[in-house]
């Protein structure tokens, strides 16, 4: 009887790629959705901000409580890297504690029941066989690890190190391997994608990647996430606009827009550049612009917050992620004066969220009546008689779901189609599948 594996991947999609590498190394195990049935339980942790750290610890304690006798519990990922010694000391019941450097050795660690902690940062390549999760159409591809930026609030460079890009050849080989397995839609990710290949002497590595993707057989759509304002360029926006494969999808975390706040946050670019990039993105036909904002950074004044509110109402992003400032040890912001009361931060979050939700409802209503390219993932997990799809521009999960409640095509398989948006139901769109999307 084969042994059973239960894996929980917390945090970002970059972490998910590493989880998929571990699944590839342990493919002889049968995956079980039940912790109690598992012989091996892996929690791939997140240690980015306080809320993520607390979630990781909570999941680890729950796994310890529910595991069967003799089951091996593994804690891997960012929390394990950042707080390796503390976890060893405080939770000795965890059998294997490993960080962000040895995902490809998980089979050996489980076999020997011993954690490795190499101190290096693992970067998945075409040489690792991943088990892609959640889709038979879409796969994430990680371009680099680490980050050369020095944002005041961010602890990631402490445990992920400096930028380390994989070669263009390596990236393309992995994409080709995934195409051969039937994947046709891709999301390219990194801490700072617009710095891709800069550590290898190439200033516009993403533009090279986009050109190469356009010449690949079998790829139908792709998008690039996590552009950084100081390294994104007008040339890059133009390359995305011209691409036949890469969608007009622009995900660029701003964190703030007030000039003084951008400087305090050490964002590396001024307000003028931020606004110029955003305007160029918005001028691209059918563009989809997403961002992330941090509220309550030390020193954020009422005037700076009001400026952010005004800008948000004027620009109208397609999607916005909001975060409350997390005071992380080891960051320059941690030492700053002017820390804000949590009640003030929460009030600001609530006000901005109200603006965002109002805009989101309006944007969904504007899509009604349009026929758009969509990616059909299969049956909806929430609605038994509906199919689950998304706008071809959208990234999985974070940008939303389109429910297909009617189809002009009999028993459509997962893949690329056209759909007509018929109505808004709550925060979701309903649509009719009309025809295949032939590239």
Curated annotation (Swiss-Prot):
**GO CC annotation terms, alphabetical:** cytosol
Q: How is the cofactor bound?
A: Binds 2 [4Fe-4S] clusters. One cluster is coordinated with 3 cysteines and an exchangeable S-adenosyl-L-methionine.
Q: Which CDD domains match?
A: Radical_SAM (cd01335)
Q: Which GO terms describe its biological process?
A: tRNA modification
Q: Does the keyword S-adenosyl-L-methionine apply?
A: yes
Q: What class of enzyme is it?
A: transferase
Which cell locations does it reside in? Cytoplasm
The UniProt record gives the binding positions of [4Fe-4S] cluster 1 as 12, 46, 78
Query: What does the UniProt keyword field contain?
Result: 4Fe-4S, Cytoplasm, Iron, Iron-sulfur, Metal-binding, S-adenosyl-L-methionine, Transferase
Assigned EC number: 2.8.4.4
- Which positions does UniProt annotate for [4Fe-4S] cluster 2 binding? 147, 151, 154
* A GO MF label: protein methylthiotransferase activity
Please write the reaction equations for the catalytic activity of this protein: L-aspartate(89)-[ribosomal protein uS12]-hydrogen + (sulfur carrier)-SH + AH2 + 2 S-adenosyl-L-methionine = 3-methylsulfanyl-L-aspartate(89)-[ribosomal protein uS12]-hydrogen + (sulfur carrier)-H + 5'-deoxyadenosine + L-methionine + A + S-adenosyl-L-homocysteine + 2 H(+)
Domain Radical SAM core stretches = 133-362
- So which cofactors does this thing need? [4Fe-4S] cluster
Q: Which residues form the MTTase N-terminal domain?
A: 3-115
**HAMAP family registered for this protein in UniProt:** MTTase_RimO
Would you identify the family this protein belongs to, as annotated?
Belongs to the methylthiotransferase family. RimO subfamily.
This molecule's function is given as: Catalyzes the methylthiolation of an aspartic acid residue of ribosomal protein uS12.
> What name has this protein been given in UniProt?
Ribosomal protein uS12 methylthiotransferase RimO
What organism is listed for this UniProt entry? Wolinella succinogenes (strain ATCC 29543 / DSM 1740 / CCUG 13145 / JCM 31913 / LMG 7466 / NCTC 11488 / FDC 602W) (Vibrio succinogenes)
């Amino acid at each position: 009887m084969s042994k059973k594996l239960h894996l929980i991947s917390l945090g970002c999609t970059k972490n998910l790629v590493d989880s998929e590498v571990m699944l590839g190394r342990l493919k002889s195990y049968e995956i079980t959705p039940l912790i109690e049935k598992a012989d091996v339980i892996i929690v791939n942790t997140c240690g980015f901000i306080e809320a993520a750290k607390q979630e990781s610890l909570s999941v680890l304690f729950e796994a310890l409580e529910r595991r069967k006798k003799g089951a091996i519990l593994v804690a891997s990922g960012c929390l394990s890297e950042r707080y390796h010694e503390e976890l060893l000391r405080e939770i000795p019941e965890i059998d294997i504690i490993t960080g962000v450097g040895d995902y490809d050795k998980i089979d050996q660690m489980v076999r020997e029941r011993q954690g490795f902690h190499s101190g290096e940062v693992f970067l998945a390549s075409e040489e690792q066989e991943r088990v892609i999760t959640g889709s038979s159409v879409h796969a994430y591809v990680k371009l680099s690890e680490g980050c050369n930026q020095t944002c005041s609030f961010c602890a990631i460079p402490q445990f992920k190190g400096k930028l380390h890009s994989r070669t263009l050849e390596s990236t393309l080989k992995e994409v080709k391997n995934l195409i051969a397995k039937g994947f046709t839609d891709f999301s390219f990710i990194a801490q700072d994608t617009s710095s891709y290949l800069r550590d290898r002497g190439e200033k516009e590595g993403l533009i090279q990647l986009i050109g190469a993707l356009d010449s690949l057989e079998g790829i139908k759509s792709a998008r690039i996430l996590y552009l950084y304002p100081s390294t994104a360029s007008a040339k890059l926006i133009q390359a995305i606009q011209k691409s036949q494969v890469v969608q007009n999808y622009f995900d660029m975390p701003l964190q703030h827009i007030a000039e003084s706040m951008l400087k305090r946050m050490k964002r590396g670019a001024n307000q003028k550049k931020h606004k110029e990039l955003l305007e160029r993105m918005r001028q691209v036909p059918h563009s989809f612009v997403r961002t992330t904002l941090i509220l309550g950074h030390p020193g954020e004044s009422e005037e700076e917050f009001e400026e952010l509110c005004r800008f948000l109402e004027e620009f109208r992003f397609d999607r916005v992620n909001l975060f409350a400032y997390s005071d992380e040890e080891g960051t320059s912001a941690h030492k700053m004066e002017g820390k804000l009361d949590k009640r003030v931060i929460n009030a600001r979050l609530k006000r901005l969220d109200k603006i965002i939700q109002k805009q989101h409802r309006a944007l969904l209503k504007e899509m009604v009546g349009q026929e758009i390219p969509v990616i059909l993932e299969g049956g909806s997990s929430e609605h038994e008689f509906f199919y689950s799809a998304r706008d071809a521009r959208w990234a999985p999960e974070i940008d939303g779901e389109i429910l297909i409640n009617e189809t002009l095509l009999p028993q459509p398989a997962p893949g690329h189609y056209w759909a007509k948006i018929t109505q808004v139901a709550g925060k979701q769109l309903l649509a009719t599948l009309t025809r295949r999307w032939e590239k």
